[in-house]
Amino acid sequence: VSGWTLEPVRYDHPEVVLLVEAVQAEYVRRYGTGDDTVLTPADFDSGRGVFLLGRLDGVPVAMGGWRARDAEQGEPGLADGDAELKRMHVVAAAQRRGFARLLLAALEASAAVAGRRRVVLETGTEQPEAIALYLSSGYAPTEKFGLYRFEASSRCLAKNLGEPPSG
């Protein structure tokens, strides 16, 4: 895509901070509250994760990251070798142009290179476009995990890396 770039950045990068504020406002609009999951820049440090910033003609329009998660962290639904997607977001003005799919593919590739075996994520019923993206990209429902695992609106999905999308 002409003008589209993806760059690894720290989670506390100023442009990421602005996008996180925007996605939190979107969560409030859809769910009545923001996402209280605690994330730190260290979660995405080299080898244990990555955080990507997508720009279109130099303007930040997308972000997303993965962090290493393993069974010994004691969380139901997690397995050794998991990479958890966090803060996947494309700004409204850039949606429906394939950027989320490009970002997702880059995150999956990065996780695979780092030796992660499965990508897991938590989303919700008020984000049907996200659920559709993940299902069409080979993700399937999995055991609930995370801060919102007891919420009826929570949906957890997983994809084994190295498998082509089904459908």
Name each model feature, range by range.
Residues 3-86, 91-92, 104-106, 110, ...:
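Acetyl-CoA-dependent GNAT
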Residues 4, 8-13, 17, 117-120, ...:
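C-terminal "cap" of GNAT-fold acetyltransferases
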Residues 87, 100-101, 124:
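Alpha-helical hinge/cap motifs
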Residues 91-93, 97, 125:
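Active-site acidic-Proline motif in GNAT/NAT acetyltransferases
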